[in-house]
Amino acid sequence: RLYDDVDKATNHYFRMPCFNSGYREYLFNEIREVMEKEPDGIFVDCMIPKPCYCSNCLRKMAEKGIDVNDDAAVFKFQVDTLYEVFSQIHAIVTPKMRLYINSYSNDWFSEFEGHIELECLPTYTWGYDFFPAQAPYYRNLAPGKELVYMTGAMVTGWGDFSGYKPDAALECDVYDAMMYGYNPSVGDLMHPRDGLNR
């Protein structure tokens, strides 16, 4: 399928793995491997429904009678595919363990999550006014669920190995979380050469 919009066709989502391919089982095996370490929870990132026209998806859409030229139908097919994937992940993860699926919409997959996470790296593209504006809105998305403010120790974004935020910036993030009734979660990255710092 050809896109009229070059940016749409070549942005990073163009390279996202297809969950109707062998990648699905690869992901499940990774989750099973992590589960052996008895973690506090599983966070599945970047689970965003995007159109895919690989041979696996084309075959499955043909089996379901989906017109591949109908963008809305193709998008719904991908949402349904991810719903199926999340159902399977939910079955793998121990019921008492935390599970969060990071996606554009909490409505699609909220039944699999025991809490809501609001992601914000103020020193990156979000800015310091993002969290205070979004926190009350997110609280209303899932009444009664735990709220988590997910920030990070890195300065310029996820994947930044060059430096850490100053203490004052991290304290500001944690204080913001507590002020709005969120539990703070400070993300870190495992350096390719070593493990996480404790």
Question: How would you label these PLM feature ranges?
Answer:
Residues 1-37, 68-75, 79, 83-87:
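Active-site-adjacent "subsite" loops/lids of carbohydrate-active enzymes
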Residues 40-45, 71-75, 81-198:
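Hydrophobic targeting/anchoring helices
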Residues 13-19, 45-60, 90-94, 163:
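Short, exposed beta-strand "edge-strand" segments with a Pro/Gly-rich flavor and a Y/T-containing core
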Residues 20-21, 54, 193, 197-198:
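Short, structured coil/loop segments at alpha-helix boundaries
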Residues 1-10, 45-69, 115:
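Aromatic- and acidic-residue-enriched segments that line the glycan-binding/catalytic groove
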Residues 30-33, 60, 191:
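Residue-level detector of solvent-exposed, low-hydrophobicity positions
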Residues 27-28, 33-53, 184-185:
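Short acidic catalytic loops
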